From Swiss-Prot:
This is FH protein interacting protein FIP2. It comes from Arabidopsis thaliana. The gene is FIP2. Residues 9-80 form the BTB domain. Expressed in all tissues but preferentially in roots and flowers. InterPro entries: 5peptide_repeat, BTB/POZ_dom, Pentapeptide-BTB/POZ_domain, SKP1/BTB/POZ_sf, T1-type_BTB. Interacts with FH1. SMART domains: BTB (SM00225). The BTB/POZ domain mediates the interaction with some component of ubiquitin ligase complexes.
Length: 298
């Protein structure tokens, strides 16, 4: 039988519509400096749903069970690269530093070869006028929040690199292997990604205006809310990519593969979609005003 103290320590959470039940101890002990610990420390009044007492948090609840399991037992889950990238994004939002470090360490362990440079090495290099990392292996390192504009990463191995909030304007990623990397909220205006491998990469919230992604592998990428205005996506493989809410106004998707791609709520005004197969793409709520749809399969 549960005591009144046990009942009072229980917390009911509604994370983007998914319901969870846990305890205050779980939310506060392992990661005491996290946003969740701050929310349930008793220092703040919590707004609950009137009937059942759920605390609502406006986030995607898909991976929150992994967050709870981490807070309970400290075990890093084994996930695919896209799911791992999404979990890392959630850990970043909730300020779960231990979980972030654990995910990054686990991704480094699965890498075949260690990175040839460290974050400190990169910071030293970018003090010079012209920086090139062509063909260099930088897999798994944290390059978040740096100014790497104009840097040449062509042919580099950038698997699972953390580029969150990094300024990469006009950087070159030609033929680079950036599978599973995280570019969340990065500045990628006018970047060149021709023939790059970005399979499973997280590009949600990025600024990709006028970026060149021709012939790139974008399978399973997340572009949710990204700015892709006038981007070049000719012959890119967007199979299973998520572009929900993205802005693709004036983008060129000639010859792009869009099987099972999600364009729900996306802005495709004046986009170039000639002879593109949209039959297996999800277009609910997409704005196609003025788009060139000549020969498109719908």
């Amino acid at each position: 039988m549960e005591t009144s103290s046990n009942l009072s320590s229980m917390v009911r959470l509604n994370i983007g519509g998914k319901k969870f039940c846990t305890t205050i101890d779980t939310l506060t002990i392992r990661e005491p400096d996290s946003m969740l610990a701050a929310m349930f420390s008793g220092r703040h009044a919590m707004c609950q749903e009137s009937k059942k007492g759920y605390v609502f948090i406006d986030r995607d609840g898909k991976h929150f069970r992994h967050i709870l399991n981490w807070l309970r037992d400290g075990v890093i889950p084994s996930l695919s690269d896209p799911d791992c990238s999404e979990l890392l994004r959630e850990a970043d939002y909730y300020q779960l530093l231990g979980l972030k470090d654990g995910i990054k360490d686990s991704r480094k362990e699965v890498g075949e070869v260690e990175a040839e440079l460290t974050r400190i090495d990169i910071i030293k290099c970018i003090q010079t006028e012209r920086v090139r990392f062509r063909g260099v292996n930088l897999s798994g390192i944290d390059l978040s929040k740096l100014d790497l504009s104009l840097v040449d990463f062509s042919y580099a191995c950038l698997r699972n690199v953390f580029f969150s909030r990094t300024n990469l304007q006009c950087a070159k990623f030609r033929n680079a292997d950036a599978e599973g990397s995280i570019f969340h909220n990065a500045i990628l205006r006018e970047c060149e990604f021709t023939s790059a491998n970005l399979r499973g990469a997280l590009l949600a919230g990025t600024n990709l205006q006028s970026a060149n992604l021709q012939d790139a592998c974008l399978v399973g990428c997340s572009f949710c809310g990204a700015d892709l205005r006038t981007a070049h996506l000719q012959n890119a493989d967007l199979t299973n990519a998520n572009l929900e809410g993205a802005n693709l106004e004036g983008a060129n998707l000639k010859g792009a593969k869009l099987s099972n791609a999600n364009f729900k709520g996306a802005n495709l005004q004046r986009a170039y979609l000639r002879h593109v197969n949209l039959r297996e793409a999800h277009m609910e709520g997409a704005n196609l005003g003025g788009a060139n749809m000549t020969g498109a399969i719908r």
